[in-house]
Amino acid sequence: MKVIISCLNSKFVHASLSPWCLAAGVREFSKKEYEVSVVEGTINGDIEMFAHKIINEKPQVVAFSCYIWNITKTLETARLIKQNCDCKIVLGGPEVAYRAKDVLERFEFINFVLSGEGEWAFPDFLDNINNDLSRVCGLTYRQNKEIITIPEKEYTDTPPSPYSDEFFKQLNGRIAYIETARGCPYRCAFCLSGRCSPLRFFDLERVKEDIIKLATSGTKTVKFVDRTFNANEKRANEILLFIKENYGKEIPEKVCFHFEIAGDILRESTLEILSSMPYGAVQLEIGMQSFNEDVLRKINRKTNTKKLIENIEKLMSFGNMHIHIDLIAGLTGEDLKSFKKSFNIGYSLKAHMLQMGFLKLLYGVDMRENSEEYPCTFNTEPPYEVTSTPWLSSNEIKMLKSCEDALDRLYNSGRFLLTLEYLTEKVGISPFDIFNDFGNSVDGNKMRLCDYAEKLYNFFSDKCDKEILREKILCDLLCCSSSVQIPDVLKIQDTLYKKAKKYFTENGNKFVKIAILYSENKIFAVDQSKEKNLHNRYEGEIYSIDELMLL
């Protein structure tokens, strides 16, 4: 039997692990022989071409991994395949597992939905597809005019490794994902992870072998998909120490390992290891969601916010890793005033990225299934974002969308950090007000960087010293790109600039870009031949004009 396992990734750079997990399960547990191949695509590609790529293989079974980012395109692909190929189509993944009956009722071209851990369930399904389907745990299927669902089975073993030779051929330098644990110790009302199987950890020696395989595959980033990497302190420490001890040896330098952690439960032992990790070897993503503990309690999230802040400040002080923190707008009980406070606290931690997301009511989460306890309105199409709550109006959420856009363009891009520092620390404008007010005054979509910088100057120039603002924006532009165009409003041409440029060129610094800081009687110089920092920008240096004897 010819079987194709497929997944539409959000971008080419992302290589989904799920189809390879299914293929590994078939190799390990099937009682029969199957011709299995993995076919990947992207949601931005030509869906008709992708469907015909699968059709041309003439499979008997096509399986799709379904998520909120690909379900629409996956269903479109499945419909095309069914119209042109005599095959059975089975869907799996979190986007269909919690509404299996609904999927079969709505989409006649889908034959089966499979829930639970696919490494075991999928080979069992293939072995029984022409026999007794009632033996297949987690399967939902049609029988005459009735839809039957078989309960899932709970597993405790380590699943087989998905990292086959074929996996590495297709990885081709993309982001590599690794799963070392399954489940989550928390039961947050907006998340599926805690609803899955109880938290269990995979064999540690196998994990170490897989880390080396992925690190030497040519990828630049190895991303751990464990929902709370530091749920087990001893185990997390052992993995971090393994990476540290092998970095620059079996693990090539420049490979970065990404972990999702709970910041408030970080212990001193883990912090000590993290402080000694090689520069750039680690990225940490910390989901705060909110700093309002009443809000966190309402969504069943336990967080010691005081300890969380303390630990993030420690992590930032190490200066050797990229720190990414998350906030969610639309949570139960959080109004605009509360969100603004959470935002300003989050911003004050000066992480390299402050991601501002919007609550999504996924199938299967408590917040979707218990509308009385968690009242809100949301979009019924993926990704199911909240459109209003009793605490946040639809207009306020739209306003926050523009705030998010400005946050990404000004701060998360790393492009305007000096300007933001000036506006917040010297002028005294609150961080939230900067992004919210400016974001809602300008449509940054498809706007060139130089035009965006000009809009920024024009918006804030009457709220502060316009000369200092001009200098800060100019310095920021020099730090972020070697080819950026400087808007005319920021330019001042005089002989001093020419003298300074000549000075650096004659001293062998031909890659240096400079700005004259008239407000300080100094020169800001950026050597763009050097590597960018953790904020993805070049470092600038300050020189005294008198010291360089340019006058």
Language-model segments: residues:
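A short, glycine/small-residue-rich beta-strand->loop->alpha-helix junction that serves as a flexible
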Residues: 9-18, 66-71
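Proline-aspartate-enriched helix->loop->beta-strand connector
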Residues: 58-62, 219, 351-352
